[in-house]
């Protein structure tokens, strides 16, 4: 596991955040397969199953394959997905999961600072804007909600 603060130049980070916030969002009424009343979030999948699935693919691709590849050193993208978790009264932990059963690598870029976090193998990583978390997504991990911002926003990248 590796944490990199200020992963992107500020202007590129701001551009990426604007693109993500402008994306069409889908409501998902369960997180990690668990369906509960307070267990919902919004997501937008930019890339999955070997194809770009968004009108913003040129911009997202140039940042992921360009700026972030300094850290990721990708051979092949598996998935690029943004998650938006609405604020809750208390920080709510989602269910532990693994992203894929096939070997891959994972990265989470946090797009805003809040009191939510990602827990990887029991270790919490704070959500700080422009922080990049590199980790093994086959290790149990989970997300949380936040209480001190309107939402918690990040981009997940799975790759080989």
What is the role of each PLM region?
Residues 1-75:
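Non-heme Fe(II)/2-oxoglutarate
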Residues 87, 125-142:
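Conserved metal-binding segment of the jelly-roll/cupin
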Residues 90-95, 102-104, 110-128:
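A short beta-strand-loop-beta hairpin characteristic of the jelly-roll/cupin
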Residues 107-108, 149-160:
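A short hydrophobic beta-strand segment most commonly corresponding to one strand
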Residues 84-86, 111, 159:
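Short beta-strand segments enriched in hydrophobic/aromatic residues
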Residues 95-96, 140-148:
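Short beta-strand His + acidic residue motifs that chelate non-heme Fe in jelly-roll/DSBH
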Residues 69-89:
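A short glycine-rich, His/Asp/Glu-containing loop-to-beta-strand
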């Amino acid at each position: 596991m590796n944490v990199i603060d200020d992963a992107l130049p500020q202007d590129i980070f701001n551009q990426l955040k604007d693109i993500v916030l402008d994306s069409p969002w889908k409501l998902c009424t369960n997180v990690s397969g668990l369906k509960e009343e307070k267990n919902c979030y919004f997501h937008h999948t930019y890339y999955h199953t070997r194809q770009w699935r968004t009108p913003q693919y040129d911009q997202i691709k140039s940042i992921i394959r360009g700026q972030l590849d300094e850290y990721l050193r990708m051979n092949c993208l598996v998935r690029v997905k943004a998650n938006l978790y609405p604020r809750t009264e208390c920080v709510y932990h989602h269910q532990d999961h693994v992203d894929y059963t096939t070997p891959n690598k994972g990265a989470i870029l946090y797009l805003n600072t809040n009191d939510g976090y990602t827990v990887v193998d029991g270790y919490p990583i704070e959500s700080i804007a422009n922080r990049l978390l590199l980790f093994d997504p086959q290790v149990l991990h989970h997300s949380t909600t936040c209480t001190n911002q309107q939402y918690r926003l990040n981009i997940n990248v799975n790759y080989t």
